[in-house]
Amino acid sequence: GPTDHPCNECSVCKSILSGQSMDVLEIDAASNRGIDEIRALRESVKFMPVEGRKKVFIIDEAHMLTNEAWNALLKTIEEPPDHVMFIFATTEIEKLPVTIVSRCQRYTFRRITSDDIAQRLQYVADKEGFALEDNAARLIAVHADGGLRDALSILDQCVGMASGEITPAVVEELIGLVSKDWIIKFLSALHN
């Protein structure tokens, strides 16, 4: 059942880790933000979990839900069935209705360090079989400002853009940065 220390070995853990669990449902509120989607969610809340003790609904980008959608969900949040848990993920908590936030436990996560993001990008590059220069990984990590999803999105775009190894020049071109070499040349020209 639910625990702070999952075993990662049982069938429930394995189905959650593989993204195949019928008891953990993620909804992207950025693209499913209306009342119809929330009504469908309310219907599925009625059903018991298939494998585990809880049915978990993760609503990502929760700040994107419409007011009508929140109003439709309010009653369910106020009196959720014992077998249901909601997780509202957002980067803009101030956009969530106060009536919702007041009924939730709030967990604030710190931004991921640039070093950790750069390491993860190198891991992804190794697993996917493409070359990523360390300085390019660091540049992406700094530009992502603590957001791993943003960093992975930039990396994905670099892969599509690069004809070989992903270098700092590829990253600079993609995100519109001026290279150090150009800045040095510019400052040198100003000085002379």
Residue ranges, per PLM feature:
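P-loop/Walker A NTP-binding region and its immediately flanking N-terminal helices
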Residues: 1-106, 124
